[in-house]
Amino acid sequence: MWYTTVRNPSIALIKQGYHILAEYNLVKEELKNIYAIPSYACGLHWFGVIFVHSGIYAGSVFRFSILLPDNFPVDISLPTVVFSTAVLHPHICPQNKTLDLAHFLNEWRKDEHHIWHPYCAERHLKFMDQLKSPCWKEATSMDCSQPSQYLGHIDSSRQLDEEEANQVVKLHCGRVPEPQREAAEVSL
């Protein structure tokens, strides 16, 4: 007996799960300095972190989430990339912290695109020449002839990331029993 995904949504869900697993294996092979993994609760929600080693964002670490459409990979709508902290960049909306992927991809084509394509777009955010073709007014309202001022804003957002990381460590230490906390501090 032949099952179609139209009549059997559970088969469609299983196929989607296998497709996401295959995409995860590709992500592990294709990317450097970007680490991503699908959520345990939902394969359509991925968590990631990017380590920037060059360019004006050198030394920065940015956490982000990727939300895939419900009908992934069949849907032509693009995934949504959301950064966990505000990033000053012309292709990242300062209000909702989303990356404008339309600059890199017009529509999702399941035979051509993979989940690592948005990650590659993120990797290319570090270049200063993109400031000449702005998408967001706040990031480009600054005078780019004064790179030190722009870099100062980048440094301040990097400090916000460090402060957030310190708060997470404090929260985690608050949950760890005292003897285990002391043992962890000694091992550092």
Curated annotation (Swiss-Prot):
Pfam family, one: UQ_con
PROSITE patterns linked to this entry: UBC_2 (PS50127)
Every UBC core domain range: 15-174
UniProt cross-references to InterPro entries, sorted A to Z: UBQ-conjugat_E2_core (IPR000608), UBQ-conjugating_enzyme/RWD (IPR016135)
Superkingdom of origin organism: Eukaryota
CDD domains: UEV_AKTIP
UniProt family annotation: Belongs to the ubiquitin-conjugating enzyme family. FTS subfamily.
Protein's name according to its UniProt entry: Protein crossbronx-like
